[in-house]
Design a protein with these regions (language model features):
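Basic, Lys/Arg-enriched alpha-helical interface segments
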Residues: 1-80, 87-115
Length: 115
């Protein structure tokens, strides 16, 4: 049994990305959106499911934009990534999805760490 979270919240940026993916006529985009939706139950049951990004490796741009103290990454179809953080409020854990990004955007945040 994993570390449970009370709820998942999408940042404005992540919500806009998900909406664009869901409304796209491209089947690959809809596949990415379906995977994001299917991760909900997995992440609620185990908020540590994603790959941990070490504190010193959290991209400064994301740290500054979202005020991150921790960051986790879930791989999505077509080399997209779902980036989330875990926050606590009144003793409860919440997952905040900060970004849903394609590999070009993700690689820009982490220069020098290409595949």
């Amino acid at each position: 049994m994993g570390l449970r979270a009370r709820d998942i919240v999408l940042s404005t940026v992540a919500a806009e990305s998900l909406l664009r993916l869901e409304q796209s006529p491209d089947p690959a985009s809809r596949s990415i959106a379906r995977r994001v939706r299917s991760l909900r139950s997995i992440l609620l049951a185990d908020c540590l499911h994603g790959e941990v990004v070490k504190k010193d490796r959290i991209p400064k741009a994301l740290k500054d934009k979202h005020g991150l103290e921790n960051l986790f990454v879930e791989d999505l179809p077509s080399f997209w990534r779902l980036l989330y953080t875990i926050v606590r409020d009144r003793g409860e854990r919440y997952i905040v999805v900060v970004e849903i990004a394609d590999h070009r955007v993700y690689d820009r945040w982490s220069p020098g760490r290409s595949r």
